[in-house]
Amino acid sequence: DGVCSNRRQCNKEVCGSSYDVAIVGA
């Protein structure tokens, strides 16, 4: 998948190859 269910969780944990910042930007 590469996308975290929760943005906060992605903040500390890496989602695939992108971070929460990448998801927010996208």
Curated annotation (Swiss-Prot):
Task: Spell out the coiled coil positions from the record.
Answer: none
Source species of the chain: Aplysia dactylomela
Q: Give the pH dependence of activity as annotated.
A: Optimum pH is 8. More than 50% activity is retained between pH 3 and 12. Inactive at pH 2.
Output the Gene Ontology cellular-component terms: extracellular region
Reported tissue expression: Expressed by the ink gland.
Which pairs of Cys residues are joined through disulfide bonds in the record? none
Task: State where it is primarily located.
Answer: secreted
Q: Which GO molecular function, any one, fits this protein according to its record?
A: toxin activity
Q: Which family does it belong to?
A: Belongs to the flavin monoamine oxidase family.
Q: Which cofactor does it need?
A: FAD
Post-translational modification as stated in the protein's UniProt record = Not glycosylated.
The protein's UniProt keywords, in alphabetical order, are: Antibiotic, Antimicrobial, FAD, Flavoprotein, Hemagglutinin, Oxidoreductase, Secreted, Toxin
Q: What is its EC number?
A: 1.4.3.2
Q: Tell me, in a sentence or two, what this protein's role is.
A: Catalyzes the oxidative deamination of positively charged L-amino acids L-Lys and L-Arg but not of amino acids L-His, L-Asp or L-Glu. Has antibacterial activity against the Gram-positive bacterium S.aureus (MIC=15 ug/ml). This antibacterial activity is bacteriostatic in the absence of amino acids L-Lys or L-Arg but bactericidal in their presence. The antibacterial effect is largely dependent on H(2)O(2) produced in the oxidative deamination of substrates. Has hemagglutinating activity towards rabbit erythrocytes.
Where does it live in the cell? Secreted
- Descriptive protein name: L-amino-acid oxidase
Thermal response of activity: Activity remains stable after 30 minutes at 55 degrees Celsius.
Q: Which GO terms describe its biological process?
A: defense response to bacterium
